Each structure stands twice: as C-alpha cells, then as structure tokens.
Amino acid sequence: MENVPTDGEAIRLSVARPEAFEPVFDRHYDSIFRYLARRVGPDVGGELASEVFTIAFAERHRFDSETDDARPWLYGIAANLARRQARTWRRGRRATQRALGGNVIWLDPAAEDRIDAQGLRQVLISAISQLRTSEREVLLLHALTDLTYREVAGALSIPIGTVRSRLSRARRQVRELLIEAGHPEVAAEFDQAGDADAG
C-alpha cells in the first residue's frame, strides 16, 4: 500500500517537487468548491475554488508544514476570496442603482408566492446578510464546513475565544431576526444548533 503524505508533508515536498502538491488538491478541492458554491454560487464558486489552489500553490512556502491538515489554511484563502467577490458585487449593484436612479428591485417580486421552504431560505439569507462581516465569516465557515472552532480560528487568523464570541453573537442575532420574521420554531432549532465544539 502506498504511503500517502499528509498535507504538511505534501506541501513541504512540493517546494522542491511541484507535482507533490497534487494530493492536497485531490483531497480538498471538492470541499472548498462546495463551500464557495454555497457562498457565491456554483459558477463563480468553481472559478474561486481554482483560484484558492493557485494561491495556495504560489504561497506554499508560507504554509506551516508541521501542520498535518491544510483545510484551515485553504478555507482562510477561500473566505478571503468570497469576501472580495461580495465586495465586487456590492460595488456593481451600487453603480447600477446610481445609474438607474435607485429604482432597482434585486429580489424576485414573486418570492412571496414560493413554497414555505423557499421563503424561509430567503429569510435566512436576509438574516445572515445583516450580520457584521466578521460574524458572518465565522458563522458560514463553521456552518458550511466541518471545521472545528480551533480550525476556524486558524483559517481566519483570530483567537479561538473570538470565534466563540462571534459565533454566539451571530447565532443570537439570526435567532432574533427569525423570530421577528415569524419563524420562532426555526429560531428554536437554530438555537439547538449551537454545538459544544470545544476544539
């Protein structure tokens, strides 16, 4: 049986032998793509996922090769790219609104007629979009990936206590917004989603 190197070993070896980086890509591309697709949509998510690995490869000499798992590092790059994409979209929307005199409706007017699940999806998107960027990043990294608090902290280069406090504030605000929107049952389930992840 072939000895498969850890992420750290593969990245360390890839500094001298670039092809050694391939197992890192093979192991993590799909999960990075899924995270980005949920953040920015599948088309842009695919482009950004490729960019994550292009950046990671170019910056591989900076990776702490004593670390066995590259996921926090890769998700950190992905979060930065998703944040940059969101800023680009916001600037584009503002420019379009200015050009059209501010009379632009970005939500589908028929959304109220959609099934309850779709309506709830919009409520959740709205609630999450109202969070501060720092809290939204922590919530989405934790909710859309299998990263522990410690790994989220590593991905965002912040202390684990900051991850816990931002996640707590984000969950509290989303719960309050769900209750205001008439979904107390979902707010209760969201409250129970607060896990005991001490990692």
Task: Identify what each model region corresponds to.
Residues 15, 38, 51-69, 88-89:
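Sigma70-family region 2
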Residues 125-137, 145-162, 176:
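Helix-turn-helix DNA-binding module
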